[in-house]
């Protein structure tokens, strides 16, 4: 039998669906969550170096939401039966090849026409190197939070990420 990660069409992920109070109400395939803009959970991991610069990532053009945008965090949807913490550790390892201690900063609700998400925001420290996941991350670089916010006025950034950065800059 061929392992799932080696098949051409692996089974679709099942993601946790929550209500506006962030209580789990079920699980659905990722495509349905996106199609119906269902409220879901996601982990966000802000990676800072020892100079307190943020690792900014360029999303690949194949991402299902905000393709080609700059993103301030590693992370992704919380899978059915998974905790925020487990999701954060998994996503950090998958996307950047990093294992690091995570510090929970805050929880954050974000909503726009394409996305409704309860996010748990974590922070970690890592100077590199990184092993970028080719399917998700096109490139990355360290930048100050102030410079990232300035860049977000002229370059496409994930809107939830910009809100998180503003909250970080205001002191959480």
Predicted segment positions?
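Residues immediately flanking
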Residues: 20, 59, 145
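Short glycine-enriched loop/turn motifs at secondary-structure junctions
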Residues: 9, 71-73, 132-136
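A short acidic, glycine-rich active-site loop
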Residues: 74-80
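Acidic, metal-coordinating catalytic segment for phosphate/diphosphate chemistry
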Residues: 2-44, 50
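Nudix hydrolase/Nudix homology domain
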Residues: 24, 29-31, 80, 106-109, ...
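Active-site segment of metal-dependent pyrophosphate-handling enzymes
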Residues: 37, 51, 61, 83-85, ...
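A short, polar/proline- and glycine-enriched secondary-structure boundary/capping micro-motif
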Residues: 36-38, 65-69, 143-144
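A glycine-rich, hydrophobic loop/mini-helix early in the fold
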Residues: 42-74
């Amino acid at each position: 039998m061929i392992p799932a990660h080696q098949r051409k069409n692996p089974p679709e992920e099942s993601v946790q669906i929550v209500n506006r109070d962030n209580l789990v109400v079920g699980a659905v395939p990722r495509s349905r969550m996106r199609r119906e803009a269902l409220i879901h959970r996601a982990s966000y991991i802000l990676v800072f170096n020892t100079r307190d610069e943020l690792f900014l990532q360029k999303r690949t053009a194949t991402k299902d939401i905000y393709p080609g945008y700059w993103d301030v965090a590693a992370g992704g949807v919380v899978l059915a039966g998974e905790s925020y913490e487990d999701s954060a550790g998994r996503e950090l390892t998958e996307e950047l090849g990093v294992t690091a201690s995570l510090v929970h900063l805050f929880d954050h609700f974000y909503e726009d026409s394409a996305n409704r998400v309860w996010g748990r925001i974590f922070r970690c420290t890592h100077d590199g190197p990184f092993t970028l996941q080719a399917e998700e991350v096109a490139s990355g670089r360290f930048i100050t939070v102030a410079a990232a916010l300035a860049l977000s006025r002229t370059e496409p950034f994930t809107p939830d990420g910009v809100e998180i950065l503003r909250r970080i800059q205001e002191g959480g």
